[in-house]
Amino acid sequence: MILEGGGVMNLNPGNNLLHQPPAWTDSYSTCNVSSGFFGGQWHEIHPQYWTKYQVWEWLQHLLDTNQLDANCIPFQEFDINGEHLCSMSLQEFTRAAGTAGQLLYSNLQHLKWNGQCSSDLFQSTHNVIVKTEQTEPSIMNTWKDENYLYDTNYGSTVDLLDSKTFCRAQISMTTTSHLPVAESPDMKKEQDPPAKCHTKKHNPRGTHLWEFIRDILLNPDKNPGLIKWEDRSEGVFRFLKSEAVAQLWGKKKNNSSMTYEKLSRAMRYYYKREILERVDGRRLVYKFGKNARGWRENEN
């Protein structure tokens, strides 16, 4: 498969297994296995004890390390905890995730029998060291941050296309193409960006997607490790945890099926408005356009 960035990746599960670390022992019982989603990071806990949020973190890690687009793994099919995940057969993984199912199954089996409670667990088979992303504190804190919940009475996000179908095509074909994006009725109705207020301060609780993204960037203490500035002066930013951002947005919109693929397609509606721009050749990198308000330092 040829990725958007021009690299080549083989989804043969034999080529994507992790290097052989020490086997799981009774020591995993000393890891934090709390039933809540503050139960530690997923790579510190035996998969049997993962919460559904740690399952999603594991899926996000596979997306990042294999340079796959978010639509390749339908997160809504894995709204389950680790015990349920570990009980799934290869056939069930394939039904849930299509072509990527075999990769998920093989990786999980490797973690179950060869994992360890360690943060420096991963190494690819292509002589590239893959470091597990760390956040301080864990980004899962954002799921329970009641002080940063947006109002949910401003419409619902349009569900766009079947991500599983798109992913099968992406993995099986040697070239990647983007599906056409339909015009969103909600975006057609969206009003022009508000004029700068007299106090020169932006609205801290944005109601549109681009404002939601902006406010995450402007409140890193409340939302650590999700998105970061690449070039603040130019308005360039990068998604660090794309699926976590999508799930947080879905929670605000009462849409449990939200994925980064759907979120990124919704972001495209702002291109014509010159509110957001895609940075060519850089995965997960965007910038604010000339009509975006409230992100510049001199506006705060």
Curated annotation (Swiss-Prot):
InterPro entries hit by this protein: EHF_SAM_Pointed_dom, Ets_dom, ETS_fam, Pointed_dom, SAM/pointed_sf, WH-like_DNA-bd_sf, WH_DNA-bd_sf
GO MF terms held by the record: DNA binding; DNA-binding transcription activator activity, RNA polymerase II-specific; DNA-binding transcription factor activity, RNA polymerase II-specific; RNA polymerase II cis-regulatory region sequence-specific DNA binding
Pfam families: Ets, SAM_PNT
Domain PNT: 29-115
Annotated SUPFAM superfamilies: SAM/Pointed domain, Winged helix' DNA-binding domain
Tissue specificity comment: Expressed exclusively in tissues with a high content of epithelial cells. Highly expressed in salivary gland, mammary gland, prostate, and lung. Weakly expressed in kidney and colon. Not detected in heart, brain, placenta, liver, skeletal muscle, spleen, thymus, testis, ovary, small intestine or peripheral blood leukocytes.
UniProt KW keywords: DNA-binding, Nucleus, Transcription, Transcription regulation
Induction comment from the UniProt entry of this chain: By IL1B/interleukin-1 beta and TNF in bronchial smooth muscle cells and fibroblasts. By IL10/interleukin-10 and IFNG/IFN-gamma in monocyte-derived dendritic cells.
Subcellular location: Nucleus
Residues in the DNA-binding region annotation: 207-289
Cellular component terms per the entry's GO annotation: chromatin; Golgi apparatus; nucleoplasm; nucleus
Disordered as annotated region, ranges: 183-202
GO biological process: cell differentiation; epithelial cell differentiation; positive regulation of transcription by RNA polymerase II; regulation of transcription by RNA polymerase II
Regions of compositional bias (Basic and acidic residues) in chain numbering: 185-195
Family according to the record: Belongs to the ETS family.
Domain comment quoted from the record: The PNT domain acts as a transcriptional activator.
Function of the protein: Transcriptional activator that may play a role in regulating epithelial cell differentiation and proliferation. May act as a repressor for a specific subset of ETS/AP-1-responsive genes and as a modulator of the nuclear response to mitogen-activated protein kinase signaling cascades. Binds to DNA sequences containing the consensus nucleotide core sequence GGAA. Involved in regulation of TNFRSF10B/DR5 expression through Ets-binding sequences on the TNFRSF10B/DR5 promoter. May contribute to development and carcinogenesis by acting as a tumor suppressor gene or anti-oncogene.
PANTHER family, alphabetized: ETS (PTHR11849), ETS HOMOLOGOUS FACTOR (PTHR11849:SF171)
Protein name stated in the entry: ETS homologous factor
